[in-house]
Amino acid sequence: MALLQIAEPGQSAAPHQHKRAVGIDLGTTNSLVAAVRSGHADTLCDEQGRDLLPSVVHYQVDAIRVGFDAKREASLDPHNTIVSAKRMMGKALADIDTRQQPYEFVAADNGMPQLQTRQGLVNPVQVSAEILKKLAERGAAALGGELDGVVITVPAYFDDAQRQGTKDAARLAGLHVLRLLNEPTAAAIAYGLDSGQEGVIAVYDLGGGTFDISILRLHRGVFEVMATGGDSALGGDDFDHLLADWIKAQAGLEGQLDASTQRELLDVAAAVKHGLTDADLVPCAFAGWQGEVSRHLFEELITPLVKRTLLACRRALRDAGLEQVEVLEVVMVGGSTRVPLVRERVGEFFQRTPLTSIDPDKVVAIGAAIQADILVGNKPDAEMLLLDVIPLSLGLETMGGLAEKVIPRNTTIPVARAQEFTTFKDGQTAMAIHVVQGERELVADCRSLARFTLTGIPPMAAGAAHIRVTFQVDADGLLSVSAMEKSSGVQAEIQVKPSYGLGEEDILTMLSASIANAQQDMDARMLAEQQVEADRVVESLNAALAADGDALLSTAERAAIDSAITHVLSVRAAGTTNQIKDAIEAADAVSGEFAARRMDASIRKVLTGQNVNKV
């Protein structure tokens, strides 16, 4: 699929002009920047030859340090040294586990977490922007000029708020974002397209703070994400914490450590973990205690976490409708996949040796660089189509508190879907649009994303207006919703930016609940639909009685209809679905003759004074 070259008038790039673009892997623990140079994609190093940049920012009174310089301050000045900001991206303060974190948290008016530093309050978006600036500077220096665009990778399960936060950070850093790219998809680009493979690929991505599993199908240059899963709060940092707790116990320390000591302990644990990648026994010393840590002990500590990742793999395969044997290749991504136990268990689960030929720390950045090179226009003849998916269905609330799905779960993006809705009452001039996310049938069981109101609808009979509601999810997974009344053209639109993110555990809980309550939800939906129909019938009959009851009905006939209305209202409040349906049918039967008389009266009124020959 050749990409169209589009530019502002007078700014068209010459065909031979090579644009500067980089791919950025904005990680929880470390970040990287990569670029395609002379047709080869590779990571870019700093002046000391290091390609990894610790995702750490240290705030001084008159300066901001990023990377290795900041990391050295983590144990000396933990209150002003922000690590793992990615874990907080797009979340409300109430959703962040602040225990064992050395920061002073303050909630902003919108619930966003803010951290008190020497330079005042900063939020995760601002912290991430500093990291992106540093990486962009490295990219510009390596490529010889200002960058024309960047592709930034995010975990597959980042929701709207987390993705928007990432884009905001890039904008704050002065970067032009070509696209946000799912990390597993980036890894598949680096492996799959370079080697020309086709088939089903599993991408196992275990980084410092997040875990993602993606099942992708690659066919004739088309990547389709068949299913995704993972845990946005599980990674190598958690391995460090488990080992740190063990070391702390061996050192005879109890209670909560001060921030500086806790940071020093985590650094010791991380060093031991790295040593155990190649050795069976690693010496360890902390707080006066000296000893050794064996690989066997470390593996015992982390086995429950590794099992959690494999359960997510099993769920993703089930969602894709596949068995392990149907997976042709398993791509390992993230520094934590260097742990021998992880590689061993993943190999056993998928029944094949995982691919590790590309450095697991670099593979995502390399894939992002390849994609950036294409999107910026350096490879206009490149053929590549990436089809990511949305993790939960998107829809809106209809009468009776029902959730009407507009875009089902696992739909590939970008996507736009539209449905038509109508008014419920005569003369209705406005409609409230409530956007929801989830798999349940009732709005009360789904997650509310946004609300807006379409006003200026021309007054007309109930059901006569045609309101077209369009849901659009762009290539970055960001949602916009618009509503338009077709006869008048009045419209309203909203960009959905939730105030906080949705964690992987929340998503799994929502999916599990939808399965466990499927029959109950459907029963509740059918009941709500009948209740809405009962309301419509009662309102319609009352309006008809008010207009023509005295003129067209006898006292007995009116009493019968009034009795039917009372019965519908009574059953609607406490009856079953079938009882409400029977009451509505009974009311229709009793009022049928009245409806016919009203129709005759309307026809006579229209024909009054008309020449028969003209009718």
UniProtKB/Swiss-Prot annotation:
Q: What is the lineage of its organism?
A: Bacteria, Pseudomonadati, Pseudomonadota, Gammaproteobacteria, Aeromonadales
Q: Which NCBIfam families match?
A: HscA (TIGR01991), PRK05183.1 (NF003520)
Query: Can you say what this protein is called?
Result: Chaperone protein HscA homolog
The UniProt family comment states: Belongs to the heat shock protein 70 family.
Q: Which keywords accompany this UniProt record?
A: ATP-binding, Chaperone, Nucleotide-binding
Q: Its GO biological process terms?
A: iron-sulfur cluster assembly
Q: Which GO terms describe its molecular function?
A: ATP binding; ATP hydrolysis activity; ATP-dependent protein folding chaperone; unfolded protein binding
Q: What does this protein do?
A: Chaperone involved in the maturation of iron-sulfur cluster-containing proteins. Has a low intrinsic ATPase activity which is markedly stimulated by HscB.
Q: Give the matching PANTHER family.
A: HEAT SHOCK PROTEIN 70KDA (PTHR19375)
SUPFAM superfamilies reported for this sequence: Actin-like ATPase domain, Heat shock protein 70kD (HSP70), C-terminal subdomain, Heat shock protein 70kD (HSP70), peptide-binding domain
Recorded hits in CDD domains, A to Z, give:
ASKHA_NBD_HSP70_HscA
PROSITE patterns xref list: HSP70_1 (PS00297), HSP70_2 (PS00329), HSP70_3 (PS01036)
